[in-house]
Amino acid sequence: MSGNRALPFAAIGSGGGSEDVGSTRRENAMRESDQTDPDEIVTVLLPEDENTHTPDAAENYNESMYLNVFDLGLEVGGWFRLGNRVNEGHAEMSVCIYLPDGRVGFMYDRPKIDNNDAMDAGGLTITVVEPFEHLTVTYEGRVCLLDDPSEMADPRAAFGTNPMVDCSVRLDYRAVSPMYGGRPQYADGREIETLNGFAKAHYEQHCSVIGTITVGDAVDVDVDGRDGVVMEIDGMGLRDKSWGPRYWQALTWYRWLPMVFNENFAMMLSVIDRGIRDDGSARTPSASGMVLVGNEYHRVTDCRIEADWNEAGEQTAMRCWAQTDEREYEVTGEVLSMIPLRSRRTTPDGNQLHTRITEAMTRYECDGHVGLGMSEFLDQVVDGWPIGVPR
């Protein structure tokens, strides 16, 4: 899966809840179409957007990069995220490794930063070698090795009772798809207000991935009597980038399903509930995504994600339907390994907000193909229960 091939430079971008396809040469901004209405929303993406941006004045400005990886032969995976919150003086650094025996290695840190010059904090470094084509991920540090990943629902206890082991990551990402997304703006160049939103810009791309992930000591026996694990990765993954003001509590819930089958077939399905409008009316959850067919993205015009749940309200399986202009898809998913994470924030008036994010490596099947990916479910927790999960 490690091959690289030339690709058309195209994007599927979102604006105002709708998405359209556009393409252009590399050196130009990508816009969905020539607009005459200055209030029309277009999507722009430039090669320099792969670099870090000058932070907005908003206290909650976030610039983040996320990359996942899955090796279908080894049935292992992982994901890596670095979010610079320079106006708050720290980054958010996450490393998550799904081991072949069901254990999970996880680390979260908030290393101090005083600038937004690079994606490099807490031992995790994400480097853009060539915009839209080639990135690398390295990590040198520790992870908490969990026999039972569900223990991370109480992170203080999980980090206090499970062993910390060395972890080394060296991964090389090469594009196998066009770009998806960008920065929505008005056609006349005005920015769209996102102070209380989730991000003002976001894009994604499927990649081939090769490299090595080592968890524990590869030679000696680790603290719980098992050898360390060395995984020579030859697989695929999805990467994304976001920037702009972000609170994890800005959305009511979402379901995000990136998945890979082979270099010619991959997809991402997303359903987002943004809650109640200012006038008190309910918003309809928005569906979006893309399907990689060959070296082209087909826009998802509609999709549904139904899930089975365990007693903790965590996803265990999925049945999905997606529609593109070309055809319909049915996808099933089975959770292989899941770790629950959380984000908490106190509002200026003293309200305690609690967000749960369940991060599950998931086996997917579609059209006779078997693949791997994530099922990432975010929910605000209200009265002790995730709001988008049926009781």
Regions found by a protein language model. Give the residues of each.
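Structured soluble/peripheral alpha/beta segments that form catalytic or ligand/cofactor-binding pockets
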Residues: 26-391
